[in-house]
């Protein structure tokens, strides 16, 4: 067998392995949050980026073996940004045989009129886009709206709110839309961005650049993203542990009087969630919570997360 054939077999093996992991992650998120139910019509929001392409591909894959029947309709919003390649998504979706709708709205013109040159346009653009997508979901009879945010997006939002907003608030895997009419789901909630990047490269999705509008990136989010990438590289398992923490919240050991009745504690109260452990040295597991080392991660024991002294 030639060297090229050996490489091809190895690449295919790695792709299959990666797809299985993404499929498992998406399947677990769907089950944990009851994202998809019998007869659902899922509107898959397709931007032309790696995340939404991956979401559509994995949902199509799961559709073949899911215990419930559901349909997919891909929707792209053409915001009339200069240089937007209008042919790419229709051609791609036609070849897949996926039902789709391209919505044309000149939100770019509205944003450029309202926002001064050089300022970030993302906030206004996002609000306009959200309203259009809600309207489109109603027109298409969609029961769920699927967005392509992944685990790293959720963690970034948590830290953004803590560092700059003074609140512990992330990005929910499932929620009721702003207009109170639509259920929004994030099937990639358990997926790592680096897995999505590798999958996207291997599948050679026709990526459409996200900065055609010329808007400046959100600098705060970029700082948080760089911080998380640095932690993931230097302390394997830290990202997984932090995401596990978001699923293991103990309100009685925080300080939000709206989540726990601190005023109601008296001499007749029971011990709640282990009482006061502030002065006890907890037993810290060697392996960070939620982390499973993988063959291709090349993670070293000496780089494991030191939970006692977080750097």
Curated annotation (Swiss-Prot):
Cofactor dependence: Mg(2+); [4Fe-4S] cluster
Keyword entries, A-Z: 4Fe-4S, ATP-binding, Cytoplasm, Iron, Iron-sulfur, Magnesium, Metal-binding, Nucleotide-binding, RNA-binding, Transferase, tRNA processing, tRNA-binding
One GO biological process term: tRNA thio-modification
EC annotation from Swiss-Prot or TrEMBL: 2.8.1.-
Pathway the protein takes part in: tRNA modification
Reaction catalysed by this enzyme: cytidine(32) in tRNA + S-sulfanyl-L-cysteinyl-[cysteine desulfurase] + AH2 + ATP = 2-thiocytidine(32) in tRNA + L-cysteinyl-[cysteine desulfurase] + A + AMP + diphosphate + H(+)
InterPro entries given in the database record: Rossmann-like_a/b/a_fold, TilS/TtcA_N, tRNA_Cyd_32_2_STrfase
Subcellular location: Cytoplasm
Disulfide bonds: none
Motif PP-loop motif: where in chain: 47-52
GO CC annotation, single: cytoplasm
Presence of the UniProt keyword 4Fe-4S in the record: yes
Amino acids binding [4Fe-4S] cluster: 122, 125, 213
This protein's record includes keyword 4Fe-4S: yes
Molecular function (Gene Ontology), one example: 4 iron, 4 sulfur cluster binding
Cofactor detail note: Binds 1 [4Fe-4S] cluster per subunit. The cluster is chelated by three Cys residues, the fourth Fe has a free coordination site that may bind a sulfur atom transferred from the persulfide of IscS.
Function of the protein: Catalyzes the ATP-dependent 2-thiolation of cytidine in position 32 of tRNA, to form 2-thiocytidine (s(2)C32). The sulfur atoms are provided by the cysteine/cysteine desulfurase (IscS) system.
Complexes and interactors: Homodimer.
HAMAP family cross-referenced by the UniProt entry: TtcA
Other remarks in the entry: The thiolation reaction likely consists of two steps: a first activation step by ATP to form an adenylated intermediate of the target base of tRNA, and a second nucleophilic substitution step of the sulfur (S) atom supplied by the hydrosulfide attached to the Fe-S cluster.
Family statement: Belongs to the TtcA family.
Protein name, per record: tRNA-cytidine(32) 2-sulfurtransferase
Organism of this sequence: Citrobacter koseri (strain ATCC BAA-895 / CDC 4225-83 / SGSC4696)
Top-level taxonomy: Bacteria, Pseudomonadati, Pseudomonadota, Gammaproteobacteria, Enterobacterales
């Amino acid at each position: 067998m030639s060297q090229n054939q050996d490489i091809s077999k190895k690449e295919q093996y790695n792709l299959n392995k990666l797809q299985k992991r993404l499929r498992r992650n998406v399947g677990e998120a769907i089950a944990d949050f009851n994202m998809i139910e019998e007869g659902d019509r899922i509107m898959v929001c397709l931007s032309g980026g790696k995340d939404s392409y991956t979401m559509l591909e994995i949902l199509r894959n799961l559709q073949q073996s899911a215990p419930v029947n559901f349909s997919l309709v891909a929707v792209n919003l053409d915001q009339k940004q200069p240089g937007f390649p209008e042919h790419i998504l229709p051609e791609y979706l036609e070849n897949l045989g996926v039902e789709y709708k391209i919505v044309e709205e000149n939100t770019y013109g509205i944003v450029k009129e309202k926002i001064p040159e050089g300022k970030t346009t993302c906030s206004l653009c996002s609000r306009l886009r959200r309203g259009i997508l809600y309207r489109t979901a109603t027109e298409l009879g969609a029961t769920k709206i699927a967005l392509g945010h992944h685990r790293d997006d959720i963690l970034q939002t948590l830290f953004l709110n803590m560092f700059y907003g003074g609140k512990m608030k992330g990005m929910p895997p499932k929620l009721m839309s702003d207009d109170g009419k639509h259920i929004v789901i994030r099937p990639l909630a358990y997926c790592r961005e680096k897995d999505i990047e590798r999958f996207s490269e291997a599948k050679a999705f026709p990526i459409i650049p996200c900065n055609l509008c010329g808007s400046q990136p959100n600098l705060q989010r970029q700082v948080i993203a760089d911080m998380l990438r640095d932690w993931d590289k230097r302390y394997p398992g830290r990202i997984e542990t932090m995401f596990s923490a978001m699923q293991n919240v103990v309100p009685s050991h925080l300080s939000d009087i709206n989540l726990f009745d601190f005023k109601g504690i008296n001499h007749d109260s029971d011990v709640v969630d282990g009482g006061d452990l502030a002065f006890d040295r907890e037993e810290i597991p060697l392996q960070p919570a939620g982390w499973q080392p993988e063959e291709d991660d090349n993670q070293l024991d000496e780089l494991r997360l030191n939970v006692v002294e977080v750097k």
